[in-house]
Amino acid sequence: MRHADVTRDTLETRISVRIDLDGTGKSVLATGVPFFDHMLDQIARHGAIDLEVRAEGDTHIDDHHTVEDVGITLGQAFAKALGDKKGILRYGHAYVPLDEALSRVVVDFSGRPGLHYFVDYTRARIGNFDVDLAREFFQGFVNHAGVTLHVDNLRGDNAHHQCETIFKAFGRALRMAATRDERLAGAIPSTKGAL
């Protein structure tokens, strides 16, 4: 069973994440950052991942610590749920459109953290959500899941659409990369024999 429960408790935040990589896309989300909850829901639904995230953070200052720490904790949960990564496809990619916006996300569960994020949002905020925080979320995830992640918004005029296509594509890319390949059962998808 590929699931994990991870808690992160600091002076700034208290985060708990529960995931089931072989779920159906159900989510229970309570981060205190409504637009971010909407984006996390995209990961769950399009990744077919059952996801529960609860967060208490210093949002009276701003949402930075909460969003970043959810990324960290979700990354740790993925690493724990995938274990030694035997039998997974390892690589995943997706292109997702939403009206005028189009984004591409490519992920490699390589064990080597690296974020390559190319997004030029058309505005700085989506409602109350600072678009810079999307990158902070992905950086936290990458560092703690041990993945290489390429995020490219190829076009878009509406910042909400830009961000939503990125999170949907991320969910779909994760789903592909974490998929078990029966032909690779028990094998680590690397010529090194380890990831």
From Swiss-Prot:
<protein>
    <recommendedName>
        <fullName>Imidazoleglycerol-phosphate dehydratase</fullName>
        <ecNumber>4.2.1.19</ecNumber>
    </recommendedName>
</protein>
<keyword id="KW-0963">Cytoplasm</keyword>
<comment type="pathway">
    <text>Amino-acid biosynthesis; L-histidine biosynthesis; L-histidine from 5-phospho-alpha-D-ribose 1-diphosphate: step 6/9.</text>
</comment>
<keyword id="KW-0368">Histidine biosynthesis</keyword>
<dbReference type="GO" id="GO:0004424">
    <property type="term" value="F:imidazoleglycerol-phosphate dehydratase activity"/>
</dbReference>
<dbReference type="InterPro" id="IPR020565">
    <property type="entry name" value="ImidazoleglycerP_deHydtase_CS"/>
</dbReference>
<dbReference type="InterPro" id="IPR000807">
    <property type="entry name" value="ImidazoleglycerolP_deHydtase"/>
</dbReference>
<dbReference type="Pfam" id="PF00475">
    <property type="entry name" value="IGPD"/>
</dbReference>
<dbReference type="InterPro" id="IPR038494">
    <property type="entry name" value="IGPD_sf"/>
</dbReference>
<keyword id="KW-0456">Lyase</keyword>
<dbReference type="GO" id="GO:0005737">
    <property type="term" value="C:cytoplasm"/>
</dbReference>
<dbReference type="InterPro" id="IPR020568">
    <property type="entry name" value="Ribosomal_Su5_D2-typ_SF"/>
</dbReference>
<comment type="similarity">
    <text>Belongs to the imidazoleglycerol-phosphate dehydratase family.</text>
</comment>
<keyword id="KW-0028">Amino-acid biosynthesis</keyword>
<dbReference type="GO" id="GO:0000105">
    <property type="term" value="P:L-histidine biosynthetic process"/>
</dbReference>
